[in-house]
């Protein structure tokens, strides 16, 4: 398939009990299929008190459930989905959408050599930038439901 797979948007769901920079923030994500894989764009606005900070964000395999970061499961990893017992963790097997905050907003893009399979997914925003060796990015702060 080529063309838009999904466009989802709305208020971010809070995954932390304490007040944070994404309380009241909104996001839009769009995933487009192409001949060589897919391209994802994430736009977040309404971020408070975090200008100059970089946050990790990733497509996750499970749903976005307010107050329950674990419900989002792990990162969507094409190797894991394919049943690979030793999956590679990288920006080629996962959708990493790190963004820097400027004037209360951030934008990220990712192009990957695969097309994510449909399901009840989410984009999760993490407390830290993604570690490119481990794929980790700290605590889960907020999420956006992505279903197709």
Describe the predicted segments one by one.
Residues 1-148:
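N-terminal leader/targeting pre-sequences
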């Amino acid at each position: 398939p080529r063309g838009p797979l999904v466009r989802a948007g709305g208020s971010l769901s809070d995954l932390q009990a304490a007040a944070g920079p994404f309380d009241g923030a909104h996001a839009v994500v769009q995933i487009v299929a192409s001949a060589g894989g897919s391209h994802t764009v994430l736009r977040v606005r309404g971020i408070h008190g975090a200008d100059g900070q970089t946050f990790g964000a990733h497509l996750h395999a499970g749903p976005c459930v307010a107050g329950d970061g674990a419900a989002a499961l792990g990162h969507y990893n094409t190797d894991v989905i394919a049943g690979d017992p030793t999956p590679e963790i990288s920006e080629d097997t996962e959708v990493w959408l790190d963004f820097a905050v400027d004037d209360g907003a951030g934008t990220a893009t990712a192009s990957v050599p695969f097309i994510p399979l449909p399901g009840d997914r989410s984009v999760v925003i993490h407390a830290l930038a993604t570690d490119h060796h481990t794929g980790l990015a700290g605590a889960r702060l907020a999420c956006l439901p992505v279903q197709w």
